[in-house]
Amino acid sequence: MSKREKNLWAGLSGAARKALAARDYKVGSLAQRLARSGVDAGELAAADRRKPEIKSIWIPGVEIFARAIYPQRHRGVFGEFVRHDEGILAKIGLWPKQWSAARMFAQSAKGFHVHPPSIPPETSAEKWQRRLFVTDPQNYSLRPYDDEQWDVMFFVQGRAEMILRDVRSGLPGRIMRFFVDGDNHRSANNVGIVVPPGVAHAIRVEGSEDVIMVYGTSTSFRPEFEGRIASEIESAGLPESWQRFLGER
């Protein structure tokens, strides 16, 4: 390192030098990136979940699976969601009872929300959820899809960041943060996502275009099945001067 490099910030004031911070350009492990800065959804869809290092960071019950998007020259694109008799949903025995669509404007976000797990009365929440997702995770017939809301999400336009946090009792509170591409951005990040009840999830629009998503739910929508957590980001408050004016009598 040259003398010049050692005194690189000599031209700044003392206060400015104290305030300086350096960006960390190191690429962390998958576990670090998944919980902090986020990873491409395609990396998760391609991951071998049988490996211990993947199992240790994956939220039980979450599914992230690749979708094929076919460009049709001079027309647009064509993409499949799911097939009833093959793929992830067929494997886990989940077929939505309701399908819906949503549009999120650019620069907007959907705050954390969560759906309540259905717990049989003869057992505790901790024991039941550990049985479903730790002790007997391949026994999909145990899952009470008709009594709790599971979400299946697809993005057909734009780019979005999804953040999941497991808040189920009896399970580790893991975090999964990843980026999904809509069908108009053909890439390995064109995926479908399954979110179990008890896993809080938030969505933030990336970039300058609106996000359009299509999602299915294992039950018909019921307002009491949706709990909000840290969702203040959804409220666009009026300017203070407007609020003062409206409060005048």
Language-model features, listed with the residues they occupy:
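Short beta-strand His + acidic residue motifs that chelate non-heme Fe in jelly-roll/DSBH
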Residues: 162-163, 193, 201-206
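Non-catalytic, conserved peripheral segments adjacent to functional cores
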Residues: 3-189, 208-212, 217-249
